[in-house]
């Protein structure tokens, strides 16, 4: 496993410990990717996982671009359409560094 895969596994475990239910991971389409799909009661949660081994370039929180946000949103819309679902949903970010994890809920 590479560091990104390890970070996604750690994020999944963390979210499950917070009471979320795992649905899917690494959902890829030509126009975007979703790292984790979780559920919190009836809300579907699309999670982008960002990991940085240091804060040299602003850390994990600064690693998400507007282009990436657009691609994640498109992928989530496509996923829901393919599954024929129309649930309430939100977009979260798990920002991880070597020694901390930050869960930002509903951040885009």
UniProtKB/Swiss-Prot annotation:
Disulfide bonds: none annotated. GO terms for molecular function: nucleic acid binding. Gene3D superfamilies: 3.40.1350.10. HAMAP family: UPF0102 (MF_00048). PANTHER family: UPF0102 PROTEIN YRAN. Belongs to the UPF0102 family. This is UPF0102 protein Sfri_0388. It comes from Shewanella frigidimarina (strain NCIMB 400).
